[in-house]
Amino acid sequence: MRVIASSIRKGNVLEQDGKLYVVLSAENIHPGKGTPVSQIEMRRISDGVKISERYKTTDQVEKATIEERNYSFLYEDGEGFHFMEPESFDQVQVTKDVVGNSAPYLQEGMVVKLSMHDTVAVAITLPQRATLEVVETEPVTKGQTASSSYKPAVLSNGVRTAVPPHVGVGTRIVVLTEDGSYVERAKD
């Protein structure tokens, strides 16, 4: 499907010269003089090479047809990450380039959305929140309940974050998968 360059957003998949590219960032630039342009940074899906393209905002580009489907995370090995479609039990392997910064938050059985082009996964969307255990932090200090200062902590997936003073080692907490920030104590 052909679209104008100014309508391209992060996460879109473009087809150019027979290859697929996932958009990492898209910015419309309107200089004081001259034609407005769209600056688009993309990663080639086949080999992970990053490129930067500049189009006039009115140029037509080819947007690939993408289908989003739910998959359950199974495991990770040297070849990549393995997911299974719950209804058909079809398994798909996803490269480390596609998973990217989401890797630490993947937990066995977690349901994620994979954006598929034919049979190739081009992007992954995690649930907004994940429940993890605090494995390392400073001891709980009595009387600091009114303080709004946070202390550093290491989670069970190895991610570092900041937690309130009342959270101790062994506490299960909910964090945002986008940036690893603390949301609340887990209710389980």
UniProtKB/Swiss-Prot annotation:
GO terms for biological process, alphabetical: peptide biosynthetic process
SUPFAM superfamilies to which the protein is assigned, alphabetical: Nucleic acid-binding proteins, Translation proteins SH3-like domain
Intracellular or extracellular location(s): Cytoplasm
Pfam families: EFP, EFP_N, Elong-fact-P_C
Pathway: Protein biosynthesis; polypeptide chain elongation
Recorded family membership: Belongs to the elongation factor P family.
Chain's role: Involved in peptide bond synthesis. Stimulates efficient translation and peptide-bond synthesis on native or reconstituted 70S ribosomes in vitro. Probably functions indirectly by altering the affinity of the ribosome for aminoacyl-tRNA, thus increasing their reactivity as acceptors for peptidyl transferase.
Name under which the protein is recorded: Elongation factor P
Organism of this sequence: Rhodopseudomonas palustris (strain HaA2)
Gene name of the encoded protein: efp
